[in-house]
Amino acid sequence: MEISDSETSVLAENLEILLLISDVGVNHDSAIFIKTKEFTFLNQNDCKVFDRLAEIEEDIDFYSVQFSGATRHPPSFLTSPRRKERLSHEKTIKKLDNVVKGIKELNPKNYLPAAGPAVFPFLDENLSYGKGNIFIHQDYLKEYLEQHNI
């Protein structure tokens, strides 16, 4: 079965899904909205469709979206430590602002932090601790959400 972007598909009497597909540049991903009689769930994970969240008109019980970085830029690039930290901070704030925007726009009953933090057991241990890089942990997220009244 092929499911098209932005089309609701009925899979069973009590199960509907809607995909929001992002196929732009290097981004090839999708978010899935699941609707049953018991609950609704939007799993966005790391799909960059924040500009399309308004397409979901249902009340959302559970919303899950990535809060921590997942790429090797800038932590593993050859540049000064100061520049890496600045770029990491900028990327982190942008990601967290998107999470806040998504939560405020969708107003879900529950938010489930997803896709983070990354753990790199064979690389520089500082990457796994989320200090000065994009791989932040839940305590950083919690504090940021509280600062934005979430």
Residue ranges and their predicted role:
Residues 2-72:
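Core dinuclear metal-dependent hydrolase active-site scaffold
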Residues 52-146:
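Cap/insert and terminal regions of metallo-dependent hydrolase folds
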